[in-house]
């Protein structure tokens, strides 16, 4: 639904739900959305930033509160749930990470829970939050941060920088350079080929991390929007639409959990490889 309340065409409805609330600086001051078409890189997706940061703060608050109140006696339901997640992530790290680094488990826990919480926003019916925002004069609102490629690439670039950092820290600058130039063919004549292959492999890691998460969540959100569009026109079709939405919702719970798990596991594996001194 548009902020002004006018009826949207099917194409407009889809486009509206897939458009972020954008803010940019222009010669005339701050501008939003259509006025930001020429701003390029310096356009801020306010909704993605709000929900991603907000969910991150919520995650830290919940886990910190549970940690402070944890007792050796009979735990409450929330404490049991948090302990189950922590144990699951800790076991995943033990199985996949072969170096020694006390920061990997907390990092993996943060990635898994944070990405899952951002993905879980996809469970909210597609019209609820945009409609509530339109009542407050906000023309666009995209509530699922991981359907914004800027967010997924930000996460992936963070992981990429950690890969570079730990590769240099563990192997040294010379060791890192040798890894790029003397593998997989250990001969000086093959240095250009090795450098090309290893550079492509290295750069492919964050790109695959970002696009996999973005693609799966974007497609899932689009299916929710299409179901709402096709079956929301009358009462009879709405009944069928609710059934389809519920079916896709149940399946999508698996998707959002799996994508958070994959992002976490690949991060662990990549950092484990960075700690391996060849």
Swiss-Prot record:
A GO cellular-component term linked to this record: proton-transporting ATP synthase complex
Alphabetical keyword list: ATP synthesis, Cell inner membrane, Cell membrane, CF(0), Hydrogen ion transport, Ion transport, Membrane, Transmembrane, Transmembrane helix, Transport
Predominant cellular place of this UniProt entry's protein: membrane
HAMAP family listed in its UniProt record: ATP_synth_a_bact (MF_01393)
PANTHER family listed in its UniProt record: ATP SYNTHASE SUBUNIT A, CHLOROPLASTIC
Topology with respect to the bilayer: Multi-pass membrane protein
Pfam families in the cross-refs: ATP-synt_A (PF00119)
CDD domains recorded: ATP-synt_Fo_a_6 (cd00310)
Domain of life: Bacteria
NCBIfam families per record: ATP_synt_6_or_A (TIGR01131), PRK05815.1-1 (NF004477)
Keyword Transmembrane: yes
Functional description taken from the UniProt entry: Key component of the proton channel; it plays a direct role in the translocation of protons across the membrane.
Protein name per Swiss-Prot or TrEMBL: ATP synthase subunit a
Gene: atpB
Membrane-crossing residue ranges in chain numbering: 43-63, 104-124, 148-168, 191-211, 222-242, 249-269
């Amino acid at each position: 639904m548009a902020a002004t309340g006018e009826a949207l065409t099917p194409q407009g409805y889809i486009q509206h739900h897939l458009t972020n609330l954008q803010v940019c600086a222009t010669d005339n001051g701050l501008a939003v959305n259509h006025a930001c078409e020429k701003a390029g890189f310096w356009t801020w997706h306010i909704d993605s930033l709000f929900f991603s940061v907000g969910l991150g703060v919520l995650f830290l608050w919940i886990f910190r509160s549970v940690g402070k109140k944890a007792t050796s006696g009979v735990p409450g339901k929330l404490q049991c749930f948090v302990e189950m997640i922590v144990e699951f992530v800790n076991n995943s790290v033990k199985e996949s990470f072969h170096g020694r680094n006390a920061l990997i488990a907390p990092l993996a826990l943060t990635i898994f829970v944070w990405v899952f919480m951002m993905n879980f926003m996809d469970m909210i019916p597609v019209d609820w939050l945009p409609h509530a925002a339109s009542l407050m004069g906000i023309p666009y609102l995209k509530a699922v941060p991981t359907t914004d490629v800027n967010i997924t690439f930000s996460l992936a670039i963070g992981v990429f920088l950690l890969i570079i950092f730990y590769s240099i820290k563990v192997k040294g600058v010379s060791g890192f350079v040798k890894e790029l130039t003397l593998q997989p063919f250990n001969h000086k004549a093959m240095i250009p080929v090795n450098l090309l292959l290893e550079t492509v492999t290295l750069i492919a890691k964050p790109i695959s991390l970002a696009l996999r998460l973005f693609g799966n969540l974007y497609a899932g959100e689009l299916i929710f929007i299409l179901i709402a569009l096709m079956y929301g026109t009358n009462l009879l079709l709405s009944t069928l639409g609710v059934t389809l939405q519920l079916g896709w919702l149940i399946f999508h719970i698996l998707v959002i959990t799996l994508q958070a798990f994959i992002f976490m596991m690949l991060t662990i594996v990549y950092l484990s490889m960075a700690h391996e001194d060849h």
